[in-house]
Design a protein with these regions (language model features):
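Alpha-helical transmembrane segments of multi-pass integral membrane proteins
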Residues: 39, 187, 191-192, 208-312
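Membrane-proximal cytoplasmic C-terminal regulatory module of class A 7TM GPCRs
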Residues: 69, 262, 290, 311-337
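Membrane-interface helix-loop-helix regions
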Residues: 67, 74, 81-132, 159-178, ...
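Aromatic-anchored segments of alpha-helical transmembrane domains
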Residues: 16-24, 92-93, 111-115, 156-167, ...
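Interfacial loop-to-helix transition and helix-capping segments at the boundaries
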Residues: 5, 30-42, 101, 118-130, ...
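Functionally critical transmembrane alpha-helices in membrane proteins and complexes, commonly lining
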Residues: 3-59, 78-84, 111-115, 128-130, ...
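Transmembrane alpha-helical segments and their boundary/interface "anchor" motifs
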Residues: 39-42, 46-48, 58-92, 106, ...
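Solvent-exposed interhelical
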Residues: 132-159, 167-168, 194-210
């Protein structure tokens, strides 16, 4: 799959929102719900992930009338595991006093979203765990029920807010509150976008801008009462998903120069490694250093990207060429959020 213009730019914006969300808790710049933009950035990553993975799987199904789960999981393993396991190894050594083997196991097996006692350095791994669980479920479901994919995705998109609101109503704050079903609508709308992208009309610039503005403003909604919180969970969050999907579709249809500017695209390319390493520096424990923490975060991300991610992607392509000498090689553009 060729690199899609503007998506690296969206990744750059997303990782910037995550870091602003963390650093927004710094006492000298605490303005409004800046920390909510961390969640918004992750939400964009989920939509992008659903879109890209589904697009990749549908292209394979169109070519061969099937989906090779083995090949899919091998590609994901080369893309995701090396950088993540290097990060885990480093922080396990640095913070061994705060670690228990169960925390390491939860991170390695991508169930950190269910680990309520994990140390602060693993707090961000909840979203990567949800994505990995999505990778385990969705390709299998798409292969088995390909003809019913649209019905399945619509049911998930509409059912998730109901499930989320019910959890809030019964005050369930245990491990299930961070589980895949709670966030499935964000992934589902990205999948739906991949299914219908070619058939959807071009989104006018004013509508694309309006959805982008709405996505930025919705986190400011004051969920200050139970009724307001239910309204946010049941209505506003699905609306935010629609706005994000609309923005993704718009920038694919009309590539923006700013999103494809080399420094912005580069930040998007290293966004996975940057997401892994920013937690080490941009946590509550280090907030008194402020925005200077961005520098070591990017430095570690660069080391991870150039010395771990890219070599493993080149190895993946080399092995793919040996396995299928005459077939197309998947590029790193199919990378997850």
């Amino acid at each position: 799959m060729k690199r899609i213009p503007s998506l690296d730019g969206l990744r750059a914006i997303s990782i910037a929102m995550v870091m602003v969300g963390h650093l927004g808790k710094w006492k000298h710049i605490s303005v409004g719900p800046l920390d909510s933009y961390g969640s918004l950035g992750v939400q964009v990553f989920f939509v992008l992930s659903g879109f890209l993975i589904t697009k990749l799987l549908l292209q394979e199904h169109d070519r061969s009338s099937t989906i090779s789960l083995g090949n899919f999981y091998a590609r994901r393993a080369f893309r995701i595991f090396p950088a993540a396991f290097v990060f885990l190894a480093v922080v396990a050594v640095l913070f061994w006093r705060e670690m228990h083997w169960t925390h390491i196991a939860a991170a390695v097996f991508y169930v950190a979203n269910m680990d309520e006692t994990k140390p602060w350095i693993f707090n961000h791994l909840w979203s990567l765990s949800i994505e990995e669980q999505f990778y385990l479920v969705w390709p299998f479901a798409l292969k088995k029920w390909h003809r019913h994919k649209t019905k399945i995705l619509i049911a998930v998109f509409l059912g998730t807010p109901v499930f989320r609101a019910l959890l809030y109503a019964v005050k369930s704050h245990g491990p299930i509150g961070g589980s895949l079903p709670v966030y499935s609508d964000q992934l589902a709308i990205g999948c739906l976008l991949a299914v219908f992208a070619k058939r959807l009309p071009r989104i006018p610039g004013y509508l694309g801008a309006g959805m982008a503005i709405a996505a930025v403003l919705l986190p400011w909604y004051p969920a200050t009462s139970p009724v307001r919180s239910l309204f946010m969970l049941f209505v506003l969050r699905p609306l935010l998903n629609v706005c994000i999907a609309g923005v993704v579709l718009h920038v694919i249809q009309v590539p923006y120069r700013a999103l494809n500017w080399a420094p912005v695209a580069w930040l998007g390319q290293i966004s996975y490694s940057l997401y892994l390493w920013q937690e080490l520096f941009c946590s509550n424990a280090n907030l008194h250093y402020g925005f200077v923490l961005i520098v070591p975060s990017i430095a570690c991300a660069c080391l991870s990207y150039y010395f771990v991610e890219r070599p493993m992607l080149r190895l993946r392509e080399k092995l793919a060429r040996k396995a299928q000498p005459s077939g197309p090689v998947l590029k790193a553009a199919s990378q997850p959020a």
